[in-house]
């Protein structure tokens, strides 16, 4: 919920998404392209989720806030790791950060949930406990 409040209050989502996109555009090293594509897929999943979720009520957002926050931070973190891995390969000819970014990108980067009514009701009962 804190991520959602911050995004709503400070209007930070669009700049963050632009940052991720611009960072990914700069990844050109062939060793990083498969992972770049994974992050792009995650990025597009988040954009699609936002389109669908924009028509939903606050209960939907509250029930899915954690998965949204995790998806956002994992995707952002992956873009940072790829960026640093590319820098390290170009400037130090070092593949240490390549290994780290590959391992990180090997997980589910956008574990978004689309809660149904039952899930929302269960979440509300837990929240109001």
Please describe what each predicted stretch is:
Residues 1-129:
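Flavin-dependent oxidoreductase catalytic core characteristic
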């Amino acid at each position: 919920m804190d991520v959602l409040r911050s995004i709503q209050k400070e209007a930070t989502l669009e700049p963050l998404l632009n940052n991720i996109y611009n960072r990914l555009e700069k990844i050109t090293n062939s060793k990083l392209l498969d992972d770049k594509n994974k992050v792009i897929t995650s990025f597009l999943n988040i954009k699609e989720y936002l389109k669908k979720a924009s028509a939903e009520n606050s209960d939907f957002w509250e029930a899915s806030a954690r998965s949204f926050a995790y998806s956002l931070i994992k995707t952002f973190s992956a873009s940072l790791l790829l960026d640093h891995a590319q820098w390290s390969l170009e400037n130090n000819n070092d593949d240490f950060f390549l290994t780290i970014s590959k391992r990180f990108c090997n997980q589910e980067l956008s574990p978004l949930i689309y809660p149904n009514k039952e899930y929302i009701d269960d979440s509300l009962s837990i929240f109001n406990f």
